[in-house]
Amino acid sequence: MPGWQALRAELHDKGLEIVTIGLDAGGADAVRPWIEAANPEHPSLIDETHIVDELFGVTNVPNAVWIDEHGMIVRPAEPANIEHSPLQDMEIPDGLPERIHDMLVEVKEIRDDSEAYRAAIVDWVENGADSPYALSPDAVVARSLPRGRDESEAAACFELGRHLHDAGDDDGAVTWWREAHRLDPNNWTYKRQAWSLASTAPGEPSDLMQGPTDLYEGNWLDDVKASGGGANYYPSFQP
């Protein structure tokens, strides 16, 4: 979040606006502390239903969609890191619990395209439609993730789970969220939402480790390993 605030401050006078969206079924209570800590000058929204998944093809965070001054999408949802994570440079200390050690190993392997991605945004702001990073409508469609039957059913299952969760039926929510995970196993936002709700104690901040529970077959670390490790967690930036 600080990186996006800094980028906005740098380029807002040239026409750039940043809108951040927190995906969290916990709503304002879950997201507000993060927004208040960042104290952003740009709009910060909350998406309790993960509607941006459904509308724009978001499957992980952070993702971004570029929309020009005419309201046209010029880059579809894609990984959107603009700051190098210090975790990737840290030396992993000895004596850590095995699971935390293994998680840090995978985090250090996550692809870092932050410098190139930030430079692409700056180029777009400077050059508009002439920027090589502003895609044609056909290219936007070609790069957008397909929405097949399984992905559509997964979106419906996730929404059913969220409705039951809001109604206090946690067991019912888990059933439908498990089905969403089965139908769309590459959607990390569905998984991470369910895992964090399952592993976060009442009244505590969201559990970012999203470790194993009895409710779901997967968890962050094991699913990352199963997908080929941290290097495959985000697809590479495609100019």
Show the residue positions of the predicted features.
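Short, thiol/selenol-centered motifs that function as redox-active sites or metal-ligating centers
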Residues: 1-7, 71, 150, 187
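Short, internal strand/loop/helix patches
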Residues: 32-61, 65-67
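Sec-exported extracytoplasmic/periplasmic mature domains
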Residues: 9-13, 36, 57, 72, ...
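Residue-level detector of anion-binding/catalytic polar loops
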Residues: 17, 41-43, 186
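Short, glycine-anchored, charge-dense loop/turn motifs used at functional sites
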Residues: 65-87
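C-type cytochrome heme c attachment motif
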Residues: 2, 19, 54, 60-63, ...
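Non-globular targeting/processing and membrane-anchoring segments
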Residues: 83-239
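Structural microenvironment flanking redox-active thiols in thiol-disulfide oxidoreductases
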Residues: 1-37, 48-49
